[in-house]
């Protein structure tokens, strides 16, 4: 299971890692070459966030209909072309950032569901989620010495495409998750959790969009973020398995607050 988790981890590396968070490396180039304002750069981030939100909401329906394996690998292999075409201009970028958000959500949710179908393992899930850190680590190296946004997006697309190919050996080893059990309850018990998670998302999206404009050595910053995301997943997975999901989430959010 560990080997399959590591192979599937290339999904979060390509989707949320390179496709979503590495976007923060590109706004300075787009501002210099395209003349983008902070508001326009923020709209690109908002389009991506909206796409991710709608992709996450639609994941059970879409992935359940087409199959989790087809949905995961299809979205993963589309990451490369979508990212590569993002550098063609502002209006295409606005649409493609939305599309990438949808695809990134299907990758993240689909891969986790496929991994959980093999058996519940906090360590394996931690390794899978840590794949985001690999994308953060690769982003600065892919963009070394790049001065043109089109070249930057092409390199990110190439990196995402390579990561997608890396996940292919796991395909014959995976099985479809069982159909979800439909409940009749309301959202009352989890409403506070949804608000907390929404506020957390609103905070870190703004931070990850504009952090490179405030920090000079963004390669070092993303390296530290990548290492942290890559290895803390291996810690948090077993910890949440030990203390339970509710307490584990409280512990994670408390440390983020500090």
Description of each model-found segment:
Residues 96-131:
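Cytoplasmic helix-loop-helix junction between adjacent transmembrane helices
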Residues 57-58, 128-149:
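A gly/Pro-rich, aromatic-decorated transmembrane alpha-helix motif that marks the paired
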Residues 246-258:
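C-terminal transmembrane helical hairpin of 12-TM major facilitator-type secondary transporters
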Residues 46-60, 223-235:
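Central cavity-lining transmembrane alpha-helices of secondary-active solute carriers
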Residues 23-24, 190-223, 229:
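Extracytoplasmic gate region of multi-pass secondary transporters
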Residues 54-87:
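Conserved MFS/SLC helix-loop-helix module at the cytosolic interface between two early adjacent transmembrane helices
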Residues 153-172:
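Symmetry-related core transmembrane helices of the 12-TM Major Facilitator Superfamily/SLC fold
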Residues 11-30, 207-212:
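Extracytoplasmic
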């Amino acid at each position: 299971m560990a080997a399959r988790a590591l192979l599937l981890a290339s999904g979060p590396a390509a989707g949320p890692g390179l496709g979503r968070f590495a976007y923060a490396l590109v706004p300075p180039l787009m501002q210099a070459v395209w003349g983008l304002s902070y508001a326009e750069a923020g709209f690109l981030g908002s389009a991506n966030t909206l796409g991710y939100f709608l992709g996450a909401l639609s994941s059970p329906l879409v992935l359940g209909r087409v199959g989790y394996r087809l949905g995961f690998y299809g979205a993963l292999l589309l990451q490369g072309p979508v990212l590569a075409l993002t550098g063609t201009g502002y209006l295409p970028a606005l649409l493609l950032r939305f599309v990438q958000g949808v695809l990134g959500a299907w990758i993240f949710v689909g891969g986790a569901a496929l991994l959980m179908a093999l058996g519940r393992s906090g360590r394996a899930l931690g390794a899978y989620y840590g794949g985001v850190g690999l994308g953060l680590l690769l982003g600065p190296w892919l963009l070394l010495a790049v001065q043109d946004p089109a070249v930057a997006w092409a390199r990110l697309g190439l990196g995402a495409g390579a990561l997608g190919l890396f996940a292919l050996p796991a395909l014959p080893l995976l099985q479809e998750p069982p159909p979800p059990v439909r409940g009749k309850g309301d959202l009352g018990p989890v409403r506070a959790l949804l608000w907390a998670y929404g506020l957390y998302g609103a905070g870190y999206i703004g931070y990850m969009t504009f952090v490179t404009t405030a920090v000079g050595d963004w390669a070092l910053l993303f390296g530290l973020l990548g290492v942290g995301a890559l290895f803390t997943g291996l810690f948090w997975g077993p910890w949440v398995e030990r203390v339970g999901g509710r307490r584990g989430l409280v512990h994670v959010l408390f440390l983020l607050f500090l």
